[in-house]
């Protein structure tokens, strides 16, 4: 017996699959793994469910996967609810075309003291450190990362994103949605290359592609189990995209943009850190100068098409700093910035989660 084993529903991929049918025995281990999982689920469920139902006096279903996953969510939500925001104060000086910040202080009076001590004093540049850094292109989307991005950019729930993506899949405009891989298989390289050429010529954000795409970076068949990463299909070139519902159009544009970004060039910039001294107190200013926009230019053009409310605030550390030299002096103007501690770090995924992409973010 031979099996048709494909990771894409495109006509070319299906034809190639039928031309390269694989022996059924190659997949016996998948069956055996499924039997092991089913047995483990049954053993945990039949024993733990009976135990905890007796202990609590009501039926309480316990599972091998859902119960520990739910426990992680409950634990993290409890940490978020218990978090208390605390204000802190940062003395700042403005001089030489930049704003430099001191240390975070819990007491406003301490920040006021530093500001007063800096009044009428001269600020001098202690050091100027420059370092060339790179930001590698992002990976292609799997279902989880796409759902996260759609929620952050458009506010769509995970189910909405899946519904839109499923509809695109049924219209043959996107590849299989329920995938956990962020790579393509080797047989998809030619399709991806032709698709990228069309996106570069026909999508507004495609104009940011100035170099040859690096498809090898997103190709690794060993990291594809059942289905490869989510990308558009070549059917997009024969479809009136304006006729699609807005949600489907948003999701399709996002995965198209990610394909161009993932195969784009590395983003290179020069990070600049300036340390100043004023009245014996140290102040730091950070900025950067872009040397090669790379894939971030594609992302920038994509975000230009979003509504203003959907654009993220620019980080002051991303702005370019004026040219400064060690020993340069200025007459600064002082002030105090008041901010609150946030819970953004608490909303990161737990280090106990086994997913590789989550562990990288923690």
Protein language model features and the residues they cover:
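Toprim catalytic domain recognition across nucleic-acid enzymes
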Residues: 1-361
